[in-house]
Amino acid sequence: MRMTKRVLIAGFTGAMGQKAVNLVNSLSDFKIVAGLSPSAENDPQKYNLPEDAQIFNSLDEIPDNLTDIWIDFTLPKAVYNNVKFALTHHISPIVGTTGLSDGQEAELIEISKEEKVGGIIAPNFGISAVLLMKFAKEAAKYFPDVEIIEMHHADKKDAPSGTALATAKMIAENRPAHQTAPDEVETLENVRGGDYEGIKIHSVRLPGYVAHEQVLFGGTGEALTIRQDSFDRQSFMSGVKVALEKVDQLNELVVGLENIL
């Protein structure tokens, strides 16, 4: 018989956190034992948590040996310290919060190796987004001229999105650094977007959107567009479920859901 895995959800009061709460509550092999949120009241049932779940407002309140898995849907300013705390306390993190720098990711991976703790950081838990990144990486072999447009809800704190940046990194692996229009002149500052190794990234923040991305490739006399749309945050939960089921098989922190599919 499988042992029930204990889960702490950081950011459980937010939209993604509540989706994660509902997911874990529906799984017989996992149980929410705690939640972390700086402003949450000590009323588990208000947030759909089990009646005996503990609620913490800061990291220093969390006791040792409380949980096996740490799900993080918090904020860019909190995620690094949260994941570092989890790893150093031998808790396997499943991280959907974006905003970590390359240096922070590298440092957390080193900590995970030292502590021998597996975990996953996923720029996007949606299967369609993972496939978009995979297809874009393959297309980059044939179309070196490419730009990315990502569109998200108005409350998203970081730009570009973690998914767009991850897409750019994967594309860059399959093509040399390449500037499509090296002599262009901007008459309006930053009108051409951010630049990652010659890949322009454009970020849109508007009400009515959830999470969407287009990768536009241009060639001589032809073009290719790959688009992904997440219309409901529930779409991300299929990836979180996979991560919950497979995180025990990891020996270190990995970046990207595609590495465990």
Swiss-Prot record:
Keywords tagged on the record? Amino-acid biosynthesis, Cytoplasm, Diaminopimelate biosynthesis, Lysine biosynthesis, NAD, NADP, Oxidoreductase
Can you cite a GO biological process for this protein?
Answer: diaminopimelate biosynthetic process
Give the catalytic activity. (S)-2,3,4,5-tetrahydrodipicolinate + NAD(+) + H2O = (2S,4S)-4-hydroxy-2,3,4,5-tetrahydrodipicolinate + NADH + H(+); (S)-2,3,4,5-tetrahydrodipicolinate + NADP(+) + H2O = (2S,4S)-4-hydroxy-2,3,4,5-tetrahydrodipicolinate + NADPH + H(+)
Its subcellular locations are:
Cytoplasm
Report the principal subcellular site.
Answer: cytoplasm
Cite the EC number. Answer: 1.17.1.8
List the NCBIfam families. Answer: dapB (TIGR00036)
Family, per entry = Belongs to the DapB family.
**Protein name (Swiss-Prot/TrEMBL):** 4-hydroxy-tetrahydrodipicolinate reductase
Organism for this UniProt entry: Lactobacillus acidophilus (strain ATCC 700396 / NCK56 / N2 / NCFM)
Lineage of origin: Bacteria, Bacillati, Bacillota, Bacilli, Lactobacillales
